[in-house]
Structure formats: C-alpha cells, structure tokens
C-alpha cells in the first residue's frame, strides 16, 4: 500500500500520462487508484475532475429519453420492471404515436437538452413496430433541431441503415455489467449479442452509447473491468446508472452501495475513459439524494434529465438550476 506522498506522486504520474502523453491507463493502474481512493478519495476525485476539465472544460451535456414502448419484455434482466418474468405493477404501453412523443419533446426543448432518445422494451421490435419508430424519428428529424438517439434492442445492418437515414446519430445498448458478471443478471440473452449490436451500429456510421448499472451486487473490480471493456469497444458515450431496486423484481431487496463507492466508481470511469462523454443516468436521485452534487466533481460531463423508463426523475428545470449552481455550462 502506498503512503500519502507516494499516492500523490502516483496520481501526478497518471495525470501526466493521460493529459500530456495522451496515453490510457492499464487495469493495474486503475486498481491501484481504487486502493488509493479508499484512503484518499479527494486525491482520485480531483484527478478525475482535472481530466474532465482538460477535455470538456465546465461543459455538461444533457440528454433525455422517452419510453416509446413499455412492458411485456420477454427478457429476464433481474433489475428491470418491464420483464414478463417479474411481478411489477407498471402501465403497459404499445408503441407510442407521433403526437405522444412530440408532446413530451415540446416540454424538453425549452431547456438546453442536446440529445433525445426513443427507448423501447423487448429484445427487438417486430417489423411493424420498427417502422412506426422510423416514422417518429423521421418527423422529429425534419421538424426539430435536436440530436436523435435510439435504444431499440438488438439491431441488424438493415435496421441500422434505416435509423441513420431517418436521422438517428447515436445508438444505445448497455453492456449492463462486466462480461464475467453478466450471467448474474440475465439468462435470456448474452452480452455477446449486445456487443454485436454495438458493432453493427458503429460499422454503419452511427455513434454508440453503452454503459451499465452499478450496485447490482458486483464488486469494484467488476466495475473497473466494465470500464475497460467499454473502452475496447470504442464507445462514444457511457451512461452510468445506479440500481433503483423496484418491487417485484429479483433485485427489489438489493442494498444500494455506499455513496462513496459510487463516487469512486464515477471517478475511475473518467480516468479509464478520459475523452468520452460519461453521463450520470438513471437512479441517481434515489441513490445519491442531496449528495448528487458531489458526483459532478468526479469527472462526470453528462446528465440524463427528465423521467426514466418506469420511474420518476427530478424536474428538468430543477436539475438545470442545480447544475448551473455548480458552475457547469449546460
């Protein structure tokens, strides 16, 4: 274990490696930073914040999602309220109409939200559902000045091309957790299927967005491994969700990890992925409460605003005001 002066020197060397030499750290260095953070959290937090400010200044990117299809999912992800295998009380919704989506979109464009995504439940949409989503995306693309994303499950090359032509610039599919821990959260599909979808999207010319959910019983080594696996995929954006244990799911009694562990995780993701957009996404209000402000000093340069898929978030106006109070430029 390094003493304090050695820890300071190690952090300086990592900063120089990333900023001056533009080199990435390896997994042993990330693990060492975790060991340092257990005793000197501010040292690692400040390193992450310095790296974030070097590449992104005080800017923070806002995105918002719309649940364009809800429930009746035939996958068995243990964290999700939309699975048919679980007993959650949610409102089932077929694919939304253009009018329903536009009504929500009109509420968010008054704020500096850069990206807007349609998200659908299930492993993949049938052809009719997919074409309805294409119609919505095409309408928004032609009539609104906002970057469009989509999260529609598994993807084919043909569908990826259609999405890009309709106006989508970024495709989302979370790895959820590390490759070695994935078996603990889902059995109806593999992480390899998710990776194949991300590769198809990237090869088509779409940017890719992929992250995960922390606090599902994994340890920090698994989280660090996820960060490196995302780096290997050359993702453009990394949403980090914090489990919100929902009644009726297998994870309803899962204990939320310590807030300090959450902050360390965020900082390590920034240091491992220094030049990527890292968003604080679902579950942040429930897990962090009044301590959420600290997260934006841990290397975060993105924030999902508004509601989530089946749970409520903070009002966009309140969230923007909070971010601006921290000196962040939205």
Curated annotation (Swiss-Prot):
Binding site for [4Fe-4S] cluster: 73, 77, 80
Residue numbers binding [2Fe-2S] cluster: 117, 149, 209
Domain named Radical SAM core: residues: 55-284
UniProt-listed Pfam families: BATS, Radical_SAM
One Gene Ontology term of the molecular function aspect: biotin synthase activity
InterPro entries according to UniProt: Aldolase_TIM (IPR013785), BATS_dom (IPR010722), Biotin_synth/BioAB (IPR002684), Biotin_synthase (IPR024177), Elp3/MiaA/NifB-like_rSAM (IPR006638), rSAM (IPR007197)
Reactions the enzyme catalyzes: (4R,5S)-dethiobiotin + (sulfur carrier)-SH + 2 reduced [2Fe-2S]-[ferredoxin] + 2 S-adenosyl-L-methionine = (sulfur carrier)-H + biotin + 2 5'-deoxyadenosine + 2 L-methionine + 2 oxidized [2Fe-2S]-[ferredoxin]
Cofactor binding: number and manner: Binds 1 [4Fe-4S] cluster. The cluster is coordinated with 3 cysteines and an exchangeable S-adenosyl-L-methionine. Binds 1 [2Fe-2S] cluster. The cluster is coordinated with 3 cysteines and 1 arginine.
Top EC group: transferase
Record-listed E.C. numbers: 2.8.1.6
GO BP annotations listed: biotin biosynthetic process
Top-rank lineage group of the source organism: Bacteria
Pathway: Cofactor biosynthesis; biotin biosynthesis; biotin from 7,8-diaminononanoate: step 2/2
Keyword field: 2Fe-2S, 4Fe-4S, Biotin biosynthesis, Iron, Iron-sulfur, Metal-binding, S-adenosyl-L-methionine, Transferase
Required cofactor names: [4Fe-4S] cluster; [2Fe-2S] cluster
SUPFAM superfamilies: Radical SAM enzymes
Protein's UniProt keywords contain NAD: no
NCBIfam families: bioB
Subunit structure: Homodimer.
Record family assignment: Belongs to the radical SAM superfamily. Biotin synthase family.
Protein task: Catalyzes the conversion of dethiobiotin (DTB) to biotin by the insertion of a sulfur atom into dethiobiotin via a radical-based mechanism.
Protein name (Swiss-Prot/TrEMBL): Biotin synthase
Species assigned in the record: Caldicellulosiruptor saccharolyticus (strain ATCC 43494 / DSM 8903 / Tp8T 6331)
Gene name in the database record: bioB
